[in-house]
A protein has these predicted regions:
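Short glycine-rich anion-binding loops that position phosphate/pyrophosphate groups of nucleotides
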Residues: 150-152
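Conserved catalytic-core segment of NTP-binding enzymes
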Residues: 105, 125-140, 154-254
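Primarily NTPase-proximal linker/entry elements flanking Walker-type ATP/GTP-binding cores
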Residues: 1-95, 102-122, 130-138, 143-147
Length: 254
């Protein structure tokens, strides 16, 4: 990615007669902005609400991936809240049957948001929980199924097979990877690992309010060709905002 930006910068300077330092700074800044905009535009996100509403068949199934600690549970709750505000009903599948208290955390949010939740036994089959949630959505005419999954800190072969099985059985319309923007290179490694072993369609970045620049967005767009569709900017339910490339570029150069 840095090679592309430097090449663009070099091309923008070739043949230019510049007399003042201010002019050089402006040319460099404009070139950098243009390069970043091109990277983001090629992998622009999409409007999930429109995507769901345009799909004729119910339910729209979304599976969430992410290691422990990235804010996956809270992100699912925020997305459920956002969908509800847009007149879209949802049901949550607590398919993390591995981590202690995972289902209780989702149950807390589901109760506060007045959204149905399907739970399973700890140590039980995550795919079965997800399957039950989809069937429940069909019988109750619910628009969207939000499927939580296990995410151990050190992703292993057993977890990969478990997640693959969830995907195989649920046939999701969308696979979202949740990443912590503060994790830097670790987040990028997680993104590569999930892409190489399971696959996903889009990213939600959390804790962006605490991240100075959010450079991982560029790496995701350029290296992995994955769009960031939402940003988590706080702990409240309404602290989930669509990713805006213009806002991101301004933030980099402020």
């Amino acid at each position: 990615m840095s090679e592309k930006i430097l090449e663009d910068l070099k091309n923008s300077l070739v043949g230019k007669k510049v007399s003042r330092t201010e002019e050089i700074e402006k040319i460099i800044t404009d070139s950098l902005k243009k390069s970043i905009e091109e990277i983001l535009t090629k992998n622009r996100g999409f409007d999930l609400v429109k995507e769901i509403k345009s799909k004729g068949k119910k339910p729209y199934v979304i599976v969430f991936f992410g290691v422990n600690g990235v804010g996956k549970t809270t992100t699912i709750a925020k997305l459920a809240y956002m969908l509800k505000k847009n007149g879209i009903s949802s049901i949550i599948a607590a398919s993390d049957t591995f981590r202690a208290a995972a289902q209780e955390q989702l149950a807390y949010h589901a109760q506060k948001l007045e959204i149905p939740l399907v739970r399973g036994k700890y140590g039980g089959d995550p795919a079965a929980v997800a399957y039950d949630a989809i069937n429940s959505a069909k019988s109750r005419n619910i628009d969207v199924v939000l499927i939580d999954t296990a995410g151990r800190m050190h992703v292993d072969a057993d977890l990969v097979e478990e997640l693959k099985r969830v995907v195989r059985i649920t046939k999701p319309d969308l696979r979202i990877l949740v990443l912590d923007s503060l994790a830097g290179n670790d987040a990028l490694e997680q993104a590569r690992y999930f892409e190489n072993n399971i696959g996903y369609d889009a990213v939600i970045l959390t804790k962006v309010d605490a991240d100075a620049k959010g450079g991982i967005v560029l790496s995701l767009a350029y290296d992995l060709k994955k769009p960031v569709i939402y940003l988590g900017i706080g702990q409240e339910y309404d602290n989930l905002v669509p990713f805006d490339p213009d806002w991101f570029i301004k933030r980099i150069f402020q």
